[in-house]
């Protein structure tokens, strides 16, 4: 079966999503096996980057860690699972995404799946292992530990926002139908 151009534009980025899941889970397995829990970890770039082994039962920045287990499962497991389903559903239902947006959404899907695997299969929470010095910015001497899935979600989310803003500016700079007599002229 030969894929059409549109089908390729939808499916090829999803292989990247799968790659994100594999890299994230393999890195977590390695960290879990070789880095002791709750220590200063392994220095990678001096004191700037360290590989640590910590668990986060909350969301980003441990938000929601104080919730009881039932609420935590609902708010941090079931709700994100529903959101992930809606993202995947809209990914396949629309042809409105440009290629950059498809790649960005695919990265978000891959990162989301990586963290959901931890959320449901790791009783201690999501394994975070990248620890970066932040020089006191926003009051953080070190940025809260994160993982590959988190990094991909944030990077792709930012890329998606920038692409939507750029797309909106391009659309708003085109003359309206009233100015061109119902025909777009560029």
UniProtKB/Swiss-Prot annotation:
Location in the cell: Cell inner membrane
Any one GO biological process: proteolysis
EC number of the protein: 3.4.23.36
Active site: 128, 150
GO molecular function: aspartic-type endopeptidase activity
Signal peptide start and end residues: none
Catalytic activity: Release of signal peptides from bacterial membrane prolipoproteins. Hydrolyzes -Xaa-Yaa-Zaa-|-(S,diacylglyceryl)Cys-, in which Xaa is hydrophobic (preferably Leu), and Yaa (Ala or Ser) and Zaa (Gly or Ala) have small, neutral side chains
Record's GO cellular component terms: plasma membrane
Chain segments annotated as transmembrane: 11-31, 44-64, 70-90, 145-165
Bilayer disposition of the protein: Multi-pass membrane protein
Alphabetized PROSITE patterns for the sequence: SPASE_II
Protein keywords: Aspartyl protease, Cell inner membrane, Cell membrane, Hydrolase, Membrane, Protease, Transmembrane, Transmembrane helix
Pfam families in alphabetical order: Peptidase_A8
Pathway(s) the chain acts in: Protein modification; lipoprotein biosynthesis (signal peptide cleavage)
Enzyme class label: hydrolase
Coiled-coil regions, chain positions: none
Annotated InterPro entries: Peptidase_A8 (IPR001872)
PANTHER family reported for this sequence: LIPOPROTEIN SIGNAL PEPTIDASE
Record-linked NCBIfam families: lspA
Function of the molecule: This protein specifically catalyzes the removal of signal peptides from prolipoproteins.
Family designation: Belongs to the peptidase A8 family.
Name recorded for this polypeptide: Lipoprotein signal peptidase
Annotated source species: Treponema pallidum (strain Nichols)
Gene transcribed to yield this protein: lspA
